[in-house]
Amino acid sequence: MKQYQKDFVDFMLGSGALKFGEFTLKSGRVSPYFFNTGAFNTGQHLSQLGKFYATAIENSILDFDVLFGLAYKGIPLVTATTIALNDGFSKNVPYSFNRKEVKIHGEGGDIVGHQLEGNILIIDDVITVGTAIIEAMSIIKANGATAKGVIVAVDRQEKGKGEQSTIQEVEQNFGLSVLSIINLSHLVDYLKQGNDHALIERIEVYRDCYGV
C-alpha cells in the first residue's frame, strides 16, 4: 500500500465519504462499509480528489490520449483530474465529457472539450453494474475513438452476478484495463494498523462471503 493510498483513506474518512456500520446496497447485500462520492462537495474536496486520481494514473503504465468523463458525475472528476495532472505532474492531458442532450446549434454535437480521438481513459467513481461503462464505450466508439481503460476511486473487489467482480467482467468482456486509487484489500490493510478488531472482523466476514 503506497502513501498516497493511505492518504486517500484518511481523506475519505475526514470528508465523510467512507463510513462504517450496516448499509444495504442496491444488490440487497448488507455491507459493513459504504463509499459515497456525494460527500466530496466542496472545492477543497474536489481539488484533493483530482490529485489522488492523477497520482493513481501516474502510478499506472496505461498510455492514453484523452481523459473522458461521462455526464453528469464524471464532469467534475475529469476536470479536477486533468488540472491535477497539469499542476502536479506537468502533463497537459486533453479532456472531454458528453452532453446528455445533443446540441444542434453553435458548435453542436454531443461532446464538450477535446475531440475524442485515439485511446481514451474513462474516469468514474465506482463501477457497480457496468452500465455507465457500456454507455461511455458507445459514445467513444461513435466518435471514432477507442476505449483503452477505466479509472475509479474504489474497487470493492466484490462479486457481481457471478463469481467475478463487475470490474473483472468489464476487463474480460470489453478488454479494458481498470485502475483504482484503492481497493478493499488496501482498506483492510489500513484498518489493521488500528485497534478496531471488531470492524476488521465484520469486513473480513463480508469479504469471505462476497469477495473475489
Curated annotation (Swiss-Prot):
GO MF, any single term: magnesium ion binding
Tell me which Gene3D superfamilies the record gives: 3.40.50.2020
Residues binding orotate are F34, F35, T128, R156
- The protein's annotated pathway: Pyrimidine metabolism; UMP biosynthesis via de novo pathway; UMP from orotate: step 1/2
Q: What is its EC number?
A: 2.4.2.10
EC primary class: transferase
Name the keywords, alphabetized: Glycosyltransferase, Magnesium, Pyrimidine biosynthesis, Transferase
What GO biological process terms does the UniProt entry carry, in alphabetical order?
Answer: 'de novo' pyrimidine nucleobase biosynthetic process; 'de novo' UMP biosynthetic process; pyrimidine ribonucleoside biosynthetic process
Reactions mediated catalytically: orotidine 5'-phosphate + diphosphate = orotate + 5-phospho-alpha-D-ribose 1-diphosphate
> Is the keyword Magnesium in the record?
yes
Pfam families hit by this protein = Pribosyltran
Q: Could you say which cofactors this protein requires?
A: Mg(2+)
Which amino acids does the record list as binding 5-phospho-alpha-D-ribose 1-diphosphate?
Answer: 26, 72-73, 99-100, 103, 105, 124-132
Offer a single GO CC term for the protein: cytoplasm
Q: Which cysteines are joined by disulfide bonds?
A: none
Q: Which family does it belong to?
A: Belongs to the purine/pyrimidine phosphoribosyltransferase family. PyrE subfamily.
Assembly with partners or alone: Homodimer.
**UniProt function note:** Catalyzes the transfer of a ribosyl phosphate group from 5-phosphoribose 1-diphosphate to orotate, leading to the formation of orotidine monophosphate (OMP).
Name it.
Answer: Orotate phosphoribosyltransferase
Originating organism: Ruthia magnifica subsp. Calyptogena magnifica
In the record, what lineage is assigned to the organism producing the protein? Bacteria, Pseudomonadati, Pseudomonadota, Gammaproteobacteria, Candidatus Pseudothioglobaceae
